[in-house]
Amino acid sequence: MKKHRIFKRILIVFLCLAIVGVTSLFIINGYVKSSGKDRILTVEKAAELDDVDCIIVLGCQIKDDGSLSHMLRDRLMRGLEVYEAGAAPKLLMSGDHGREDYDEVGAMKNYAIENGVPSENVFMDHAGFSTYETVYRAKEIFEADKVIIVTQEYHLYRALYIAKQLGVDAYGVSSDLNTYAGQSMRDFREVLARCKDWVMCIFIPEPTYLGEAIPVSGNGDLTND
């Protein structure tokens, strides 16, 4: 009987902790989403902004043969649309190039050049391993204080929240040009990612790599391999 009471109390404690945890997830998720809603603009409205340093296109997975995924292609198409509208003079491609045989940013820059953007106007952040690291490095390495971030809308909320917490004046343009397979799972993972980056923005850890400044006002070819 005594063991039964102890088990019951333990179960109640775990249930209470679970309720608190789930409630916290939803509160933080809602807070992160709401903090950047008014900074998501159309291409036309983004082009009306003044003194934007660069357009940041956030990377995502490329295929085994190095070609672009549908999601990444849409980000690049929208990023180039914002660039061609005159919203900013430079593009910053940020993604994962942590291995010699996997290069998101190289594929992204090649796409921009193939579509008429001068190579010197396209910067690459080879160590943009996460959204948090991308925004941190945009400010500290590329000296970008005012930016337009391009990615799918579900991802924009978190990127804009991080930018706000790190002191970057950021606006977003959505690249939802299609529907994407597996989006329900991405939406679920994004809830957890928002909570993780909410914590990151409290402690402000340094990214995996820092280094010498490469001002985005200069020549993007300085970031070539």
Regions found by a protein language model. Give the residues of each.
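A general structural signal for short secondary-structure boundary/capping elements
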Residues: 99-104, 171, 193-200, 217-222
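A structural signal for short, hydrophobic/glycine-enriched beta-strand patches
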Residues: 28-188
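Short, Lys/Arg-enriched, disordered terminal segments
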Residues: 1-10, 87, 220-225
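N-terminal type II signal-anchor transmembrane helix
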Residues: 2-45
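Enrichment for repetitive, rod-forming helical segments
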Residues: 15-16, 82, 203
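Short linear elements at protein peripheries
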Residues: 207-225
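A transmembrane-helix-recognition feature enriched in membrane-embedded lipid enzymes
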Residues: 187-209
